Amino acid sequence: MKLPKTLLFGFFFGIIFSSAAQEIIVHDPVVAKQDGTYYLFNTGHGISVHSSTDLENWKQEEPVFSEKPEWTDEVVADFKNHIWAPDIFEKDETYYLYYSVSSFAKNTSAIGVATNSTLNPNDPHYNWQDHGIVVQSVPNRDMWNAIDPNMIEGEDGTVWMAFGSFWDGLKLVKMDDDLTKIAEPEVWHTIARRERSFKLPDTDPGDAALEAPFLFKKNGYYYQFLSWDLCCRGDQSTYKVVVGRSKDVTGPYVDKEGKPLNEGGGTLLIEGNENWYGAGHNSTYTFDGKDYIFFHAYDANDKGAPKLKIAELKWDEEQWPSLKEGVLK
């Protein structure tokens, strides 16, 4: 769930880029690179945007939406244009920006999508065209939450959307050819879940705390990074990042010990220490031959301000990821 969070950041190994990058205030960062410039999109009013040529020095750009998309009030009454957890995806020279509209701690939610031919706001062709709802969840109807989208293209060219938060786990759904709707007939898979107490009402997010799947192709596998446990609880936060993998985009995903993510499996990648109130909602990319993980972490020494973190991934002999040497202090 993507409102301001006081998360707990992990004791982990990583190269963290310059202080300029660390000082950027973000939630749920995703990134695309076009013509030598990195464009970062994150949770914020109208979807916040930053640009950089070096992953260190960032320029704030105008938000994607100066006014809320027209359809949002149909999902969330009196929606304030605070849009959560975007994902940016490029195919056939078109950029697709998926985003989340929701009420905190409810599955009154929908994922929308907008398209653009360029990410450069100075390009005369720069214009975000909104296409409305891709998928919507409704309380007492659905046991899943339509937020936290992530797009992945399979080996056969089929595009899938992973998404979800709490309830009965994280989902993967096949997209139609224009990537603005779910394919018909619908094809759904559950790609991660944790045990949920049967005593809770269906409208309750539940105690199976997981969200924000991000799928990444590497080494002949699809890796699923996801966030576990609780944010938003100050120094009691337990938010962390775990990972699993599969040979098939639809799963089953398993952790390093072979436990399925659908049965609560997950290999720990990032967890907290006394200096950071959590890390989560990561994205993972290959830029210029190097693999990077982007995420936000809350600074215990700066009143819990959420900071952008970027680390380089490394891979062991069994092709499992960890973060590069060095400990975040």
Per-range role (PLM):
Residues 20-329:
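Carbohydrate-active catalytic/glycan-binding domains of CAZyme proteins
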Residues 1-22:
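Bacterial Sec-dependent N-terminal signal peptides
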